[in-house]
Each structure stands twice: as structure tokens, then as C-alpha cells.
Amino acid sequence: MIKTLFVFGTRPEAIKLCPIVLHLLSRPEEFQVTVCVTAQHRAMLDQVLKVFSVVPDYDLDLMQPGQTLSQSTSRIVAALEPVILETRPDIVLVQGDTTTTFCGALAAFYQHVPVGHVEAGLRTHDLAQPFPEELNRVLTGRIASLHFAATKGAASNLTAEGVDPRAIFITGNSGIDAVLQIRDRLDLGDLPQTAYPWRDPRKKLILITAHRRESFGSGIESICRGIRRLAVRGDVQIVYPVHRNPKVAGPVQQLLENHANIYLIEPLEYVPFVELMRASHILITDSGGVQEEGPSLGKPVLVTREKTERPEAVKAGTAVLVGPDEHRIFEQASLLLDDPLEHTRRSLVHNPYGDGHASERIAAAMCSFLR
């Protein structure tokens, strides 16, 4: 019996860890599962937990308005210590690159508990992009005993840093497990008119997400100007679930509100967001998860960042780096809108991030490593 403690706190972590939680729970003779959430992102975390019917054993509820990174880091590490001492796990599983990820790994390290890092080995090799995520994942990688890399490229990053190859397992990305499970629940066809009464199925839908810290200020403003130029076309509808952070919502509202063909909506729960991705013609995003999910749904992705820790989609052709640059956004989106062959070429490439079976591979790796 392997005693496994999951630690996570945000929506992206929950999306990528819940499929693993459910898989381990389906094998009760092999795994004892404990789930601890920090609630770094309270509302959006709860939405995902509900979708996957995962009930935390520990809810630390540490989110406070206006917390600095230093404050949240110290509070999370301190709050996790008694949880680890009480549960005495054989392994602590963390995912990705959030403050909770690093704090979960650090708290486990302080108690001499091995750490398994899901989605290990992503690197931009620039600590400022993304900030603070690049440092979080580098430090988590130094602490981890088990590294679950989604791709060969991520595994190569780890070996280049001196990680023992025997501790690296190429599993695919568990986020693909999640999106394929949700996709199979959805009805076919366009978006429901009740939820999106403005939707005209004759027009091509463009989905926007942008929330990265490194894009705050001039970056978000430039992205918005590119979107505004695209909206002049009569054959598109642009939908933007706007992040609640004032540094995002402020310029977005100022530059895009009340423009024809642009629809600013509230942040979406996970299932409606997957539904919206599936109905879209193009995805324009700075999100790491959307860069992975887009290829699974056959959607070309324009990445509004100068660097990405997920180069596989760029190499495969399904994603293009356009930066927070209004001209590149407009040019690349126009190409996909005007050239059906180019759109098809970018939509049909093989998804480099996984096949929906990462959870099983992660479970098998833990069994071989810990027994």
C-alpha cells in the first residue's frame, strides 16, 4: 500500500491532478489517497473539484486578498507541516509551477518525504519568463525524487540539469487525460444558444485568454489592440473570458468593451471552457494548459508570449509564438482565417503532449519506484 498525499491549490493543478487522484482511488488495494488543497485560487479550484467529484481531506483555505508571494509562500509551507506529520505519506505529489507546487515540495523535503513532480522538466531557461513560475519549477525539480515528464524534451531538460535518468518517467501530460474525459461528456454541435445568445454559427469563433504577469501593462494593451483589429472583420466573433485580476480586467474593459464582434464574459468553469475551445476556430492564449489542450481538440493556437516552456507544439506546427504583439497576432490570425489549407495543416498535427493515459503511467512509475 502506497500512501500518497496530493497537494495543490489552483485550477490548473486541479485539472491535471484530479485524473490521477481518481485513477489511484480506483486501485484501493495499492494506493491510500489523501488530498490536501491550499485554495490558492478558491473559487476556480472548487469548480474543478466539483467537476471531477474530488473531495479534499484537508482544505487549508489560505487565500487572502492582496497576499504577496512572500506571504503566501510562508503561510503555505507552515500550514502543510502538520498535514504531512499527521498523514505520514510515502510520497507527496505536486504538479506544475505554482507557489503551492514549490511550497508542497519544500514542506515534504523538510519532513524527509519523497516528492513526485507531475509535469516536470518544463523550462524557458529565463527566470523572468514566466515569473515566478520558472523558478518554482526549477526549485521543485531540485527537490523531487520522481520526475513525471510529459515529453522527451522535458525529460532532456532534466538530464541536462543532472537528474538521474532512472528517476525520470515520460508519461504524457495528465491535462490531456482531463480534457479528453470532459470532451467525451459534451454534446456535439455548436455552442448552446441559451448560454451564448449572441452566437452566430455562420461566423468563425476566436477564443482569447490572457492573464500572465509578464504581460501586465503594455503587453495586455498590445494584445487587445490586435484583437480589436481582428474584430473589424465581418466573419468573426471573438469571445474573451476576462480574468478578474484588475491588471488584466482594467485594460481589457477599457480597450475592448462595447466593440462589435467582441464578447467579454466572466471567467468560465472548466467544462464550459472546454466546450468553448471545441467550438472555436482559433485559440489565442498565454496559458500553458491551452497550449496543450488545443492540439487535443484539433485547434490551432497562437501563443501571446515570446518564450514557451512547451516548444513541442511549436515544432509540430500546431502553435505559433506571436508574443504580446498586435501586428503578429493580427497577421497570424488573419492567415488562419483566410487560408483553409493552412488552418487544416495546423489543426491535424499529432498532439505531442499525450494520449490520455498519463495517470496510469504515473501510477505504474510510483509502484516501481516505491516498492
Role assignments for model-derived ranges:
Residues 1-240, 245-371:
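Nucleotide-activated sugar donor-binding and catalytic core shared by glycosyltransferases
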